Curated annotation (Swiss-Prot):
Name listed for the protein in its UniProt record: ATP-dependent helicase/nuclease subunit A
Family as reported in the entry's similarity comment: Belongs to the helicase family. AddA subfamily.
Native source species: Staphylococcus aureus (strain MSSA476)
Biological processes per GO annotation: double-strand break repair via homologous recombination
SUPFAM superfamilies: P-loop containing nucleoside triphosphate hydrolases, Restriction endonuclease-like
Amino acid sequence: MTIPEKPQGVIWTDAQWQSIYATGQDVLVAAAAGSGKTAVLVERIIQKILRDGIDVDRLLVVTFTNLSAREMKHRVDQRIQEASIADPANAHLKNQRIKIHQAQISTLHSFCLKLIQQHYDVLNIDPNFRTSSEAENILLLEQTIDEVIEQHYDILDPAFIELTEQLSSDRSDDQFRMIIKQLYFFSVANPNPTNWLDQLVTPYEEEAQQAQLIQLLTDLSKVFITAAYDALNKAYDLFSMMDSVDKHLAVIEDERRLMGRVLEGGFIDIPYLTGHEFGARLPNVTAKIKEANEMMVDALEDAKLQYKKYKSLIDKVKSDYFSREADDLKADMQQLAPRVKYLARIVKDVMSEFNRKKRSKNILDFSDYEHFALQILTNEDGSPSEIAESYRQHFQEILVDEYQDTNRVQEKILSCIKTGDEHNGNLFMVGDVKQSIYKFRQADPSLFIEKYQRFTIDGDGTGRRIDLSQNFRSRKEVLSTTNYIFKHMMDEQVGEVKYDEAAQLYYGAPYDESDHPVNLKVLVEADQEHSDLTGSEQEAHFIVEQVKDILEHQKVYDMKTGSYRSATYKDIVILERSFGQARNLQQAFKNEDIPFHVNSREGYFEQTEVRLVLSFLRAIDNPLQDIYLVGLMRSVIYQFKEDELAQIRILSPNDDYFYQSIVNYINDEAADAILVDKLKMFLSDIQSYQQYSKDHPVYQLIDKFYNDHYVIQYFSGLIGGRGRRANLYGLFNKAIEFENSSFRGLYQFIRFIDELIERGKDFGEENVVGPNDNVVRMMTIHSSKGLEFPFVIYSGLSKDFNKRDLKQPVILNQQFGLGMDYFDVDKEMAFPSLASVAYRAVAEKELVSEEMRLVYVALTRAKEQLYLIGRVKNDKSLLELEQLSISGEHIAVNERLTSPNPFHLIYSILSKHQSASIPDDLKFEKDIAQVEDSSRPNVNISIIYFEDVSTETILDNNEYRSVNQLETMQNGNEDVKAQIKHQLDYQYPYVNDTKKPSKQSVSELKRQYETEESGTSYERVRQYRIGFSTYERPKFLSEQGKRKANEIGTLMHTVMQHLPFKKERISEVELHQYIDGLIDKHIIEADAKKDIRMDEIMTFINSELYSIIAEAEQVYRELPFVVNQALVDQLPQGDEDVSIIQGMIDLIFVKDGVHYFVDYKTDAFNRRRGMTDEEIGTQLKNKYKIQMKYYQNTLQTILNKEVKGYLYFFKFGTLQL
């Protein structure tokens, strides 16, 4: 179908317009960061409905997350409503408003689940299945692995024995089990897991594939050998400039001849390389050279450095790639084949038994969703089934968001339900391979890359490719600097995609023309003589200084108004690769009293309150675990002192367990009687809880512990009590989650928690910070994807990449399979095999490529300004980075492949055009002035020494002052002693006032007077209300998604706060539009709409009170006030026994010079039989007379005007006071 011509004045760019209307073939939209892909996707769906007349439920829209799906469906629904209002007679649009609720806008997992629920009979499974939690799934999988390994121990096949010798230790099979588990997850990410496992042995058995692996290594080694040859030639050129270095030149000449032979004919002669020695030692330098001028001495050092680089590169190739002869490597592969085949057999056994266990428990996991869906959609020969054909007929288009994060199974599912081939298909894909950062979840970016390379701009003969490159998020300085970095860093060799004109970012946001350069801040660490802080702590303090500087000097631009506002805390985000720096940052921000929140999924199990409960549970499960038993005794619950524990141990120093020592101490006649009683009470508790745990689920045991010892109340009263309380409730809810699994009992729950900890499935502290809270945030790059912030501080750049997996004896790769090191069982020695060397090299390349993509995601989160924070031990290392080798317009491939961290590359790229000391051959071909505007960096590079950071000075001064004070006190200065005594003896003259609140709400005053009228002591009631804490109703007991009455009340007040008042009244349609507007502005949540009582609001809109307000001269909403109680109550002047009153009035309007206030009430009330409306009105007036009297008196006091009031009850109507 032809793309319609774009009219004049539309907001869409040409590429966006094509993305909205291109059809008739598969379409791949490469949408760069901030290019408006979600808006384009929504518009395409809308145009399919409006222009093409397609029903919304005949489109399949696949998103990456459930949140994205909900947001997408809401946007589409909103657009359909707008279109329906504009064309109320359109029957098609009316149908869409109904069908949107059945529309398939969901994650692929949700689609698969629906498919299974509708066609479970094909699978021969019970339709009443449930989805297992991840932790339950892992526990069951590990249980299965244990059982399968035990079965194979009974068989004792020779290959199995060799596997255990290689992959297990004398103490445990943990590594062996971990490899089996990894292989299982890799296999199920393929459409045919069994076939994938069967193919693992092929490279070990077939010489043709072994030859391919040798060629792969040869190609990889060429990068390093070529770089080595370049370094050798540079060394030769530098030595040629000097006198008295003939011997040096002779050595280098010999090396050049050797290298020429290795590279002869453009091929790498591996046998020659491995059969000869390279990197002969250079002669000592003569005194004549050492006494030469400074330039010559520098040249000598550079020459030696280049020769050293040449030698290290050759050594790397020989040690990493070709440490053994090719024939030996092939022989090793043959010997490894039985082990690899047997390992695959074990994994298939695990898969079979794991599936059997899941079926017996009637549970499915997310992998089952995908594979069962495939089973439904395909015949045995892999062709689409009849069901698949029916879906092909039903779905007129399939739209996939975040396509770069799909895997091979998901790709197969999509291919089963799409129609046609690429040149005439109905598959629309949107994504950005530069933001593919989920390889650990088995995402396969090669799917996107293959299509990107295959599809064409005009779509001739294949699919159509569209590049969305215009960025509407960031300032041009952020974009041009990002482009410059990636044009020199990313290509097909490292990064897996070419960063060219099609891939780069183009400026599209309407910012003003002010200059906002990117800031690269390099912190040079202070040594131990100048600071007691570690390097990480120094960086944390430095980041705080940057935040303070932003808050003091930077402003945020409002594109709509064209004006600036001051920066606030919530405008700033700190991005890091992981949460390793979180604790240091928390402390640094706390020291400066700056509100700070870590958006972390880590640290939950390290919180004091959570550790206490876990120690309690572990001690109950097994009191012979000393660390947990003693931890519980020392806790705030039992408060045993160190000297008491010492007394217990002294009497029984040889006991294996502390529990035994406690029992022995109680029975010892010499024991302290008071301590014995305390211990008896403790053991009684332990035994009581043990008995209780046998008959009750874990969550009830936790609940009993909380109630018995007032755990919630205690931790709620500490600093950060809100978060601590949430953490305790969170653990309680995790116990509920566990109880809903197929496991039971305290021991299994502890295993459940241990598995979460081991897998890094920490939950972070329970989140008590909302998206609009004014705090500085820290989050990982992964969690920031899709978000944007005015100020981004990208720190931790100097933290090395995590290459731990590359050191494992087994390397896994989706494309190539399994690379296992060779292990000589007799000699108990391990060697890299041909497969493990090749796959390890491939894995390292893929790892560095994904780390580059993480950098891209981080840089493109910034709207206004970007701060890059690097850290070095000393400034000398910066010179080495400036002199990294280049190849054309890129940092050399070998330099990129071996880069240890992001800073290594970023600093090298950005510093090359600014450093005067870099020789021309180490500079990029294009001078900075020749670079086009869209890629010309605007960056300030600052080298900061931590000794100069003001925070350090402050810390030092505080420390010095504290020491001086201590010394003065210790020296016994009489004046100081007298001053201290005076302060300690001081009697506060207003003790009684401390028992009264200095500030009270109107509601609190209302309760006070009601209590006094009933003859009850208000002080006692107030203390009870403040001190007593009860559980909030847990989410698991609430109806799914149902709000509580107080939450609905708040929601209704929020709607009323923004409700427009029009003389002609607003219609029901306009009311829906107005509420959708509140959702769009994030004033209320999207899912809150269903809880808004539309009929009650429409009743108010049709009321006389609404008309009166609409005709008022002035209207004020949500007016807060603070006033002296003495003025309101008209107390005598000088009466100091008063408080400040604070409150909030819902609405005030002015009519004919009189001020009226309105208070909305969502109260429900009981209409007793026979009561008239007048009687109910009187009852309601009496209920709120005190509160209303305070409102009236307060306003009269403040305004000095006549004030009247209304109460409006949504369930009753208007009452005038």
